């Protein structure tokens, strides 16, 4: 993981064990020993910026001990030594709560687990099969868990809302600022969960790395350094509803100052803007064809009047209604260096149901049966309670399965049929 972050330029906080609290006696001694060994092993990895003393605050005395280890074994690395919380301990070189907006004029303050909401990729919205009601799911600690059972439209919108809270307190906006936060999960994974599935679904991709709408929403917001540097627009969801459907809410994420929505060339007007990048339309009538969002940005450089502004189109995005399912498309996602028949390499097989023009059919949920030939092992796909390993539900009409090859002597072939 550390080398992967080095390669793509993701900054990291390196922990030294954790008990969700400050500890004492031999347990604290073990944490000090682990921090020493971790620093020695990882101090030449450039993606590590922070040395984390604990996932909860530690005492001033313990903070000084951790800093002493850093000073001895990595005196010139430029890393900050701190911990979660630590708002009241001046010796900590960084801090921040788990979820909230903390600001400081001295130390970096960032949230350690921002946006813990969950949502399964198979749930588009309330008006699409399988018609999952927003927030519907099992109780968590005896209470409704709405925020852990999102549909993908509201999940993407909540991502925009949450990131805006950090962005508006970003560096450069005053003397006391927030330095942002770390997304708790990038891809759905087998960690502590609160939603209906047996794994955490807070990711912007599912566990097989298929993007959710929230992934593309982040591409719009994170298209640059602190603020987007390139204009972009994205329509959340699909455009395949039953005739006569009135879509309750249409979301668009855009860097524009205004966004105009068109259905088959007819304007539905400008969307209501919120949270900097989110634009919303209510009660949108479905009409098969093309839905398109056009973003405009104001030019305030007109020197004739302080209030003068002209708008120009800066980006657009469109979705077409997919036709009837026509065929299944398989795409192998392999090692960038090529598939190695060494008995250990794996291939992700992306499975899509598409129409005659190759457009993905978003609502076809028939079962797909898989067969394979050759020396390979079926590892499976997304974790579900169903233990049948030869079938996969075409959730939102796009799935991934994993194959592991057995020997270097035989080629393997896979076939899928509905």
Regions found by a protein language model. Give the residues of each.
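Exposed aromatic-hydrophobic patches
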Residues: 278-284
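Edge beta-strands of extracellular beta-sandwich domains
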Residues: 302-324
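Short aromatic-acidic-glycine turn motif
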Residues: 327, 371-392
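Extracellular Ig-like/FN3 beta-sandwich strand-entry sites
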Residues: 286-290, 344-346
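Short, solvent-exposed loop/linker segments at the N-terminal edge
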Residues: 240-245, 337-347
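Beta-strand-rich structural segments
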Residues: 250-253, 294, 345-361
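Substrate-binding/catalytic cleft of secreted carbohydrate-active enzymes
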Residues: 1-214, 218, 227-240, 244, ...
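Short beta-strand segments within Ig-like beta-sandwich modules, predominantly Fibronectin type-III
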Residues: 269-275
């Amino acid at each position: 993981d550390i080398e992967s972050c080095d390669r793509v330029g993701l900054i990291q906080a390196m922990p030294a064990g954790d008990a969700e609290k400050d500890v004492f006696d031999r347990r604290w001694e073990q944490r000090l020993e682990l921090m020493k060994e971790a620093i020695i092993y990882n101090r030449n990895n450039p993606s590590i910026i922070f040395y984390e003393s604990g996932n909860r605050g530690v005492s001033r005395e313990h903070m000084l001990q951790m800093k002493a280890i850093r000073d001895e074994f990595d005196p010139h690395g430029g890393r900050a030594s701190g911990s979660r919380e630590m708002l009241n301990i001046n010796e900590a070189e960084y801090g921040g709560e788990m979820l909230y907006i903390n600001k400081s004029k001295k130390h970096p303050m960032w949230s350690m687990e921002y946006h813990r909401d969950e949502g399964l990729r198979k749930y588009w919205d309330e008006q699409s099969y399988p018609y999952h009601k927003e927030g519907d799911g099992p109780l968590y600690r005896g209470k409704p868990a709405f925020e852990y059972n999102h549909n993908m439209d509201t999940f993407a919108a909540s991502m925009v809302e949450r990131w805006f809270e950090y962005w508006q307190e970003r560096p450069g906006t005053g003397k006391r600022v927030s330095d942002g936060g770390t997304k708790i999960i990038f891809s759905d994974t087998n960690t502590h969960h609160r939603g209906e599935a047996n794994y955490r679904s807070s990711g912007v991709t599912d566990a097989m790395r298929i993007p959710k709408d929230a992934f593309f929403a982040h591409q719009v917001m994170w298209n640059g350094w602190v603020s987007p540097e390139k204009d972009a627009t994205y329509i959340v969801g699909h455009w395949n509803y039953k005739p006569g459907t009135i879509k309750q809410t249409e979301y668009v994420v855009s860097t524009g100052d205004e966004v105009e929505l068109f259905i088959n060339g007819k304007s539905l007007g400008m969307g209501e803007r919120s949270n900097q990048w989110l634009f919303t339309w209510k009660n949108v009538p479905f009409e098969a064809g093309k839905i398109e969002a056009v973003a405009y940005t104001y030019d305030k450089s007109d020197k004739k009047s302080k209030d003068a502004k002209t708008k120009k189109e800066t980006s657009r995005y469109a979705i077409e209604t997919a036709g009837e399912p026509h065929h299944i498309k398989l795409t192998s996602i392999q090692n960038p260096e090529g598939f190695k028949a060494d008995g250990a390499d794996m291939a992700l097989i992306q499975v899509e149901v598409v129409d005659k023009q190759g457009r993905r059919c978003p609502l076809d949920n028939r079962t797909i049966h898989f067969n394979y030939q050759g020396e390979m092992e079926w590892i499976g796909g997304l974790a579900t309670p169903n233990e049948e390993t030869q079938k996969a539900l075409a959730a939102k009409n796009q799935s991934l399965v994993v194959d592991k090859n057995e020997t270097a002597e035989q080629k393997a072939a896979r076939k899928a049929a509905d």
